């Protein structure tokens, strides 16, 4: 199986959710991550702290890191799937989609032997 990076962008801010919505979302995430783990498809991933900086040849920019209309990257997952279509199917089932977010799916290139 190949590895894929899910960049979790946008989504409804946690401050706009009720306690019941937060609890339901956490349960959905637990079920999703559990399913990936049971199938040996979960490699890693974490939420990201808001803010950040961009390093460019001109220096550092500490303004909010924004990825355009798709929204700020708020977290990532690394999963295993047979191909990009199967990875996209896993992304569609992710609770982040139900949270008004979107997911960029990118294949991770294997490192060549040194």
Provide a role label for each language-model segment.
Residues 1-114:
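Conserved, structured core segments of small domains
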